[in-house]
């Protein structure tokens, strides 16, 4: 009986890992993206992994969100609840995205604009209470502030995104550094 329970746990873990491995990475978009996300907090929600229609349902929902420019983002559902947790109920991650050329991007207070790393997956380090990911990421993002373009990076969202190395199960996380303030193009 004990070995049967252990086998069930192992099989379930393998299915979850394989599902994560099969997630296609977010495609790079030419130019810059200006986005407003409906639901930024994320974590591990197992239900969408086992629902073959979850992506299709989210795409349908996101079409009705705010405007026709709204798109389903990232190929996953985000959990209802605080970021960094495990949730059994999920909502779709709908983002309004517009392609704009870099000089036209203006800072909008309180809005996510351009992210250096859009890959999102299961990153275990930031879940651990003894790992001060916020401090580490704030320092990392501050180091990027000497950009010649005048972009100002800020640590965004209180979480880490996985390092992009193809698709796979990520243990190490990279900081999600976002440009929050961008110098406006000088009017001439």
UniProtKB/Swiss-Prot annotation:
Residue stretches spanning the membrane: none
Main location, first listed in the record: secreted
Keyword Secreted on entry: yes
GO cellular component: a single term: extracellular region
BP terms from Gene Ontology: defense response to fungus; killing of cells of another organism
Keywords linked to the UniProt accession: Antimicrobial, Disulfide bond, Fungicide, Plant defense, Secreted, Signal
Keyword field contains Cell membrane: no
Disulfide bonds: 37-95, 45-77, 58-92, 62-94, 123-178, 137-175, 141-177
Subcellular location: Secreted
Signal peptide span: 1-28
Similarity comment: Belongs to the DEFL family.
Protein name in the entry: Defensin-like protein 99
Species this chain originates from: Arabidopsis thaliana
Native organism taxonomy: Eukaryota, Viridiplantae, Streptophyta, Embryophyta, Tracheophyta
